[in-house]
Amino acid sequence: MKLRFIECHIPKHLFMGIDEIREWDGVIWANVKTNGTISTIQILTTLKDSEKIVDKLKEMYGGANYRVVVFEPTMTYPPIEEEEEKEEPERLIREELYNIASDIANLSKENMLMLILSTIVAIAGIYKDDVALLIASMIIAPLLGPNIALSLSITVADYKLALKSIKTLIAELIFVIILSMIAGHYLPISLDNPQIHSRITLDFWSIIIALSAGIAGSLSTVSNISSIAVGVMIAIALLPPLAVFGLLIGAGYVEQSFSALILFLINMIAINLSAIVIFSAYGISPYRWWKKEEARKYTLYAILLWVTLFIAIFVLIIYH
């Protein structure tokens, strides 16, 4: 059972009492501490109940000078006995997911350095036909973050996060393509290279693999299951096909390069489509009631867009 420890810091004179909070559904333990003019409400709950408790605290104290902080306890004593009930999927709360998405969609110096290193490693792995180097570039997975963040921004109708994700994604795509084109211009690139040939040969399995890995990646994000994240990064790698696209353009193989671009688009669409569907299925939505309908509308539009693009690519592969 995954737990969360919630603290809500509020002005002392606004505190409404702890007895009502202790009666809330999902509260395992609750207490209040007062220090000067600040009262701190402390609540121990399960991960699956934490979002509704945070929302209730927002309703009670949202208009005040308050601050909610959520921790993940490493242990608690006495042990908590789990009640036998219908098992529900556990996921991170909305705010936790938002913080993760905002961080991975940030065009920071650190993220750009990781992008430079992973692109260089990917180019070297492709050129030398070295699978180990390619896997290393996939694990870094710099292009995965903005796509996940974009999908979450649509699900919660957050335009600032959407714009931030799109800007970061475009900047990273342009950088990878330009760096790969420069490398392709100076390196002796051959279409017989196994790593290049495998990324310009498309079939129906490309879509199946991309969708499967996209779903697994979305589940690992929403459930915070890090054990499958590495496998997902390798299975749905965005960087190698994009690097192959740039290398072939730089080497003058313009016509052949578009197959690698299509493979990249298949993977990117799969990530976004899977993420939106999984986020919606797990009940992730805006906190404000007036944004919920707006989020549902844009989620539907996004799903229709990604499905349409998938069908178009599928037809393109058949008649390619």
From Swiss-Prot:
It is a multi-pass membrane protein. The keyword Membrane applies. GO terms for cellular component: plasma membrane. Keywords: Cell membrane, Membrane, Transmembrane, Transmembrane helix. InterPro entries: DUF389. It is found in: Cell membrane. It holds the Pfam family DUF389. It comes from the Archaea. Its main location: membrane. The chain crosses the membrane at residues 107-127, 131-151, 169-189, 200-220, 228-248, 260-280, 299-319. NCBIfam families: TIGR00341 family protein, uncharacterized hydrophobic domain. This is Uncharacterized protein MJ0678. It comes from Methanocaldococcus jannaschii (strain ATCC 43067 / DSM 2661 / JAL-1 / JCM 10045 / NBRC 100440).
